[in-house]
Amino acid sequence: MPKAAVYSGEKGYEELCKRDDIDLVYIATDWLHHFPVAMCAMENGKNVAIEVPSVMNLKECWALVDMSEKTRKHCMILENCCYDWFEMNTLNMAQQGVFGEVIRAQGAYIHNLSPFWNHYWKNGEGDKLGWRLDYNMKHRGDVYATHGLGPVAQALDIHRGDRMQPLVAMDTKSVVGKA
């Protein structure tokens, strides 16, 4: 097997996306690079698979949709929490009727990282937190909303013959992060 090509640096992905022998770019970088890498890949004729969150705001979301439609390239958002053992087992039980007819479901993903603020990924010696914890400290709310929503949507067959009509999100006083 040939040795894997390595691309590095802030814009290293641009060279990767220009290759003719690649059909799909799988994006599992820090969150702030998901969008620019996806756009570059589709602009260069590649299909895209992006870990969540795929974008950081609604403007970027529509830009991905528009680029996918313009280039006719797939842009698939990946939600790895749909495929862990517990979630797959629960989905199987729901599909087998173990719970009866599922008519209401509730999901959440709570990942308090404050105990790790001094022991997590760093971007260099001067970096106190690293990109992941920096984001958690500066923002409130569920930064991985699809982790809780994805498995529930699968169990309810959302977009497989059913769809969400009301969607409710709640917020309480901040325990960690921005007040």
Q: What is the predicted role of each segment?
A:
Residues 13-20:
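Short amphipathic alpha-helix with an adjacent loop that forms part of the alpha/beta core around
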Residues 71-76, 81-179:
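Predominantly a Rossmann-like dinucleotide-binding segment in NAD(P)-dependent oxidoreductases
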Residues 9-11:
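Structural motif corresponding to alpha-helix initiation and N-cap regions
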Residues 24, 30-31, 35-83, 97:
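Beta-strand-loop-alpha-helix segment that lines the small-molecule cofactor/substrate pocket
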Residues 1-4:
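N-terminal Rossmann-like dinucleotide-binding module
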Residues 16, 25, 105:
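Receiver (REC) domain switch-region micro-motif
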